[in-house]
C-alpha cells in the first residue's frame, strides 16, 4: 500500500523558537522525525517548511536519504493549509494517501504512521486518525487531553476537550473525580494528533470556512464533522511518547534518547 508522509516544520514557535532545529544528540529534531517516517515504509517523505534555515539544515541529510524538502508560504493559518500547498506543488492524485506527521514528534513510533495509512486505505472515509485509552479521571478531565467518541464502526462522533462520554452515575453528584487518579472505564479515549488524508479531500477541507464548533473547542478536526464527512478512529498499536512543545519537553526527549 502506497502512501506519502508530509512533516510540517514551521520555524517560529512561541514557546520554543526554532523548534524544528532544536539539537537532540547531534541532530535537529525534525531529522529524528524524518528518520521515524522513513522507517514506516512510506513511499515518499516530504518536509514542508517556511524557513530557509530548516531547508539548509536538512539539505545534506535529505539528499542522502532521498527525502524532499518543500519550501512553503509563511502565511498559512494551520498545518493543514501547509499540507494542501504541498499536495498542489507535487500534483498528487486525489486518491493519494497523505499522512501528516508533526515535526515536533521525534519519538513517534513508525508502526503507527503505517497504521493510520493502512486504516484510511480500508475505511469509507476521507480522513483517519488514532487514539489511546485514557488511564484515569485526571486525564479525562484535563482540557489539554482531547477526548474522542466513535460509533460502533470506529467513525468519530465528536472530539472535545470536555470529558466525553459523561458518566452520569459517576460524575453527576459532583466533579470530585476531576484531578483523581481513580481508574476510569475503557470507553474513554484520548485523541492523538496524527492524521491520514486522501489528497483530494485536503483541498476541499481548507476551502471550507471554519466551523462554530472548531472555534469553540479550538479543535480543527471538528470542521470535518461539521460539514458531514467521516473521520475513522482506531486505537494506536503503540502510545506515542511525549511530543515537544516546551524546553521541559525537549529535556525529557533528550533524556529518553540518552537511555
UniProtKB/Swiss-Prot annotation:
It is found in: Cytoplasm. One of its GO terms (molecular function) is 3-deoxy-manno-octulosonate cytidylyltransferase activity. Pathway: Nucleotide-sugar biosynthesis; CMP-3-deoxy-D-manno-octulosonate biosynthesis; CMP-3-deoxy-D-manno-octulosonate from 3-deoxy-D-manno-octulosonate and CTP: step 1/1; Bacterial outer membrane biogenesis; lipopolysaccharide biosynthesis. The keyword Nuclease does not apply. GO terms for cellular component: cytosol. One of its GO terms (biological process) is CMP-keto-3-deoxy-D-manno-octulosonic acid biosynthetic process. It catalyses: 3-deoxy-alpha-D-manno-oct-2-ulosonate + CTP = CMP-3-deoxy-beta-D-manno-octulosonate + diphosphate. Keywords: Cytoplasm, Lipopolysaccharide biosynthesis, Nucleotidyltransferase, Transferase. Its main location: cytoplasm. Belongs to the KdsB family. PANTHER family: 3-DEOXY-MANNO-OCTULOSONATE CYTIDYLYLTRANSFERASE, 3-DEOXY-MANNO-OCTULOSONATE CYTIDYLYLTRANSFERASE, MITOCHONDRIAL. Activates KDO (a required 8-carbon sugar) for incorporation into bacterial lipopolysaccharide in Gram-negative bacteria. This is 3-deoxy-manno-octulosonate cytidylyltransferase. It comes from Aeromonas salmonicida (strain A449). The lineage of its organism: Bacteria, Pseudomonadati, Pseudomonadota, Gammaproteobacteria, Aeromonadales. The gene is kdsB.
Amino acid at each position: 500500500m502506497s502512501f506519502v508522509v508530509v512533516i510540517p516544520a514551521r520555524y517560529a514557535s512561541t514557546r520554543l523558537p526554532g523548534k524544528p532545529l532544536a539539537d537532540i544528540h547531534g541532530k535537529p529534531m525534525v531529522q529524528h522525525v524524518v528518520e521515524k517516517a522513513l522507517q514506516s515504509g512510506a513511499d515518499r517523505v516530504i518536509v514542508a517548511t517556511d524557513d530557509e534555515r530548516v531547508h539548509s539544515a536538512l539539505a545534506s541529510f535529505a539528499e542522502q536519504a532521498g527525502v524532499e524538502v518543500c519550501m512553503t508560504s509563511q502565511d498559512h493559518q494551520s498545518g493543514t493549509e501547509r499540507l494542501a500547498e504541498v499536495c498542489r506543488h507535487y500534483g498528487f492524485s486525489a486518491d493519494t494517501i497523505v499522512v501528516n506527521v508533526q515535526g515536533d514528534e521525534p519519538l513517534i513510533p513508525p508502526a503507527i504512521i503505517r497504521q493510520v495509512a493502512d486504516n484510511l486505505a480500508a475505511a469509507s472515509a476521507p480522513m483517519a486518525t488514532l487514539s489511546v485509552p485514557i488511564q484515569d479521571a485526571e486525564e479525562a478531565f484535563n482540557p489539554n487531553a482531547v477526548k474522542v467518541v466513535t460509533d460502533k464502526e470506529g467513525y468519530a462522533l465528536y472530539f472535545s476537550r470536555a470529558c466525553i462520554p459523561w458518566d452520569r452515575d459517576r460524575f453527576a453528584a459532583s466533579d470530585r473525580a476531576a484531578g483523581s487518579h481513580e481508574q476510569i472505564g475503557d470507553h474513554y479515549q484520548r485523541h492523538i494528533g496524527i492524521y491520514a488524508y486522501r489528497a483530494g479531500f485536503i483541498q476541499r477541507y481548507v476551502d471550507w470556512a471554519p466551523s462554530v464548533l472548531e472555534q469553540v473547542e479550538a479543535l480543527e478536526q471538528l470542521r470535518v464533522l461539521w460539514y458531514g464527512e467521516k473521520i475513522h478512529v482506531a486505537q494506536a498499536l503503540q502510545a506515542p511518547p511525549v511530543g515537544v512543545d516546551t524546553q521541559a519537553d525537549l529535556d525529557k526527549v533528550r533524556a529518553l534518547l540518552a537511555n
